[in-house]
Amino acid sequence: MIVTSKGRYALRIMIDLAQHREDGFISLKTVSERTELSMKYLEMIVGNLKKAELVQSTRGKEGGYKLVKDPKDYTIGEILRCMEDNLAPVACIKEGEIQCDHSGGCLTVPMWKELDDITNAYLDTVSLEDLLTGEKWRNKT
């Protein structure tokens, strides 16, 4: 699994909105300045986040974006899945993907499917709040 820049930047945007959630709607210009991401890229990413109903927007002078839920109620899995076509570790197990010539007898497919399940399950245990506080990883060596 390789998380693309879209997925990584979506997390940065969601973290920024979470850190400043008391400010109400936040303009993309402000998010751009704080995250050092281009406006053009931000527009594309927040469009996906809005379509997935992870953020809401309003127009006008006080317009911008904000989270629709509390940070503890977002999983990293749901954020990444709205940005990434697929988080599968190999192409042959991607949903709708054309199988390779060896898929019928491939002995590695069960392992890849299990890795995919483990990865997705883990990402669904990590919340946006976990990233904000870092508590989940404190005292781990």
Q: Residue locations for each model-derived region?
A:
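Basic amphipathic alpha-helical segments that dock to polyanions
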Residues: 45-50
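C-terminal regulatory/oligomerization modules of transcriptional regulators
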Residues: 76, 94-141
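Beta-hairpin "wing" of winged helix-turn-helix
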Residues: 53-67
